[in-house]
């Protein structure tokens, strides 16, 4: 069985090499944190799974949140950046790097890409990718130059958190370790699947397509 910790960076503040894990050919087991609360994430992180899916698109609301809707029950809502970063770090640190947090990002929330990756997410997923340009734009947001246009975060890591192998930088680690996944779940996306597949990192949403 694959050992996730062998794919860890030199510090848990940096993302685990989820790309290499996905390309290893080994069977990976995953779970999901559907309750957007640090305590739920802490409990889930004790499980023996390889990765944990955190859905920033349609997180379940707490009972307290539902009460504020004046009797109108709303099943889900997007996560805010602070809670998202906290869930990612909780999974990463509580599991001691044995479970990779990866996140589905809302289509029009490019700022959450930075928050998720800066927090240490091993991968990000964009829903409803319909054409190659959307896929390229998503990769550009997630990768530092020369692979993309992501802005360098000067305050994301401090001290020992910046440790890397000789000749490497934390930006190399982010570029090489974080998986960028495109979720295809529309007719237009299926029509353009061959072009989208040319962009590194692709995953289809079979349940959505059905």
Describe the role of every protein-language-model region.
Residues 1-32, 164-176:
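N-terminal amphipathic alpha-helix/helix-capping segment at the start of soluble metabolic enzymes
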Residues 12-15, 37-38, 63, 81, ...:
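Structural motif corresponding to alpha-helix initiation and N-cap regions
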Residues 17, 63-106, 110, 114-117, ...:
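Alpha-helix-loop-beta-strand connector modules within alpha/beta enzyme cores
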Residues 17-54, 60-62, 75-78, 88-91:
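N-terminal capping/small domains of soluble enzymes
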Residues 28-33, 52-54, 99-105, 124-126, ...:
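Hydrophobic faces of well-ordered beta-strands that scaffold small-molecule active sites
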Residues 33-47, 107-115, 187-200:
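Short, acidic/polar
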Residues 56-59, 106-107, 129-131:
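Short, ordered loop/turn segments at secondary-structure junctions
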Residues 111, 119, 123-210:
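Conserved anion-binding
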């Amino acid at each position: 069985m694959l050992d996730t910790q062998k794919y860890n960076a030199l510090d848990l503040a940096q993302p685990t090499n989820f790309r290499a894990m996905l390309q290893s050919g080994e069977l990976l087991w995953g779970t999901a944190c559907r309750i957007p609360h640090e305590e739920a994430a802490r409990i889930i992180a004790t499980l023996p799974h390889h990765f944990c899916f955190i859905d920033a698109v349609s997180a379940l609301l707490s009972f307290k949140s539902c009460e504020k809707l004046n009797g109108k029950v709303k099943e889900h809502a997007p996560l805010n950046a602070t809670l998202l970063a906290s869930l990612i770090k909780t999974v990463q640190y509580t599991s001691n790097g044995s479970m990779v947090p990866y996140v589905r990002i809302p289509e029009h929330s490019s700022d959450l890409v930075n928050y998720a990756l800066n927090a240490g997410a091993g991968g990000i997923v964009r829903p409803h990718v319909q054409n190659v340009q959307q896929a390229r734009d998503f990769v550009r947001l997630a990768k530092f130059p020369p692979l993309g246009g992501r802005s360098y975060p000067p305050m994301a890591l401090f001290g020992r958190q910046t440790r890397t192998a000789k000749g490497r930088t934390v930006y190399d680690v982010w570029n090489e370790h974080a998986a960028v996944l495109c979720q295809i779940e529309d007719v237009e996306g299926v029509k353009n699947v061959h072009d989208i597949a040319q962009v590194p990192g692709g995953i289809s949403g079979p349940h959505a397509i059905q």
